């Protein structure tokens, strides 16, 4: 016998449906297939922002820090960035991103790398959409939205300058829900 919280069970069922059917994302002209425990792009505001914000002039290389499902890397590749290095430290996220990159036919443009935050080198564009709740996750599904002690956010902000080319841009895409809830 085992006991599973209803919230956890509903999360597993939702993740299964998203993975089976995919989430339509117009900015990539296709669908993203999220895995359980990897953030699903069910709200499109941040995706639309990446799809429409002006890219740095001549941007042929970008870093996507904490790629998760690979959605930001895919949007950048669809926009014409020739090489996107997408990083994550989580094997589940990298497997999810790989599946999505392959299904979207973007393997030539996107390199996936397991590392904690930044790859080596510098890029004219470095993008990060970190988890937005500064708390400790208690289940696998929460890793997609919980950033203990804002570790990822602080690491991105602290390391960004060392990974930008001169006149490069860092894009931090983050929800303000933690501020509204008094968590940050």
Give the predicted meaning of each segment.
Residues 14-17, 35-51:
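Conserved SAM-binding loop and adjacent beta-strand
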Residues 43-128, 134, 138:
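Conserved SAM/SAH cofactor-binding pocket of Class I
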């Amino acid at each position: 016998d085992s006991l599973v919280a209803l919230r956890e069970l509903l999360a597993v069922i939702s993740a299964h449906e998203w993975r089976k059917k995919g989430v339509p994302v117009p900015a990539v002209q296709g669908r993203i297939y999220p895995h359980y425990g990897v953030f699903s792009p069910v709200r499109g505001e941040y995706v639309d922002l990446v799809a429409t914000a002006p890219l740095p002039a001549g941007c042929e290389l970008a870093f996507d820090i904490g790629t998760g499902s690979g959605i930001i890397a895919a949007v950048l590749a669809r926009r014409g960035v020739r090489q996107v290095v997408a990083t994550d430290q989580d094997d589940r996220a990298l497997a999810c991103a790989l599946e999505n990159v392959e299904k979207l036919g973007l393997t030539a443009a996107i390199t996936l790398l397991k590392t904690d935050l930044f790859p080596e080198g510098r890029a004219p564009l470095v993008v990060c959409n970190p988890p937005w709740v500064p708390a400790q996750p208690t289940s696998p599904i929460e890793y997609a939205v919980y950033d203990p002690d804002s570790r990822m956010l602080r690491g991105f902000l602290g390391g960004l300058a060392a990974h930008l080319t001169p006149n490069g841009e860092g894009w931090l895409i983050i929800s303000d829900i933690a501020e509204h809830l008094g968590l940050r």
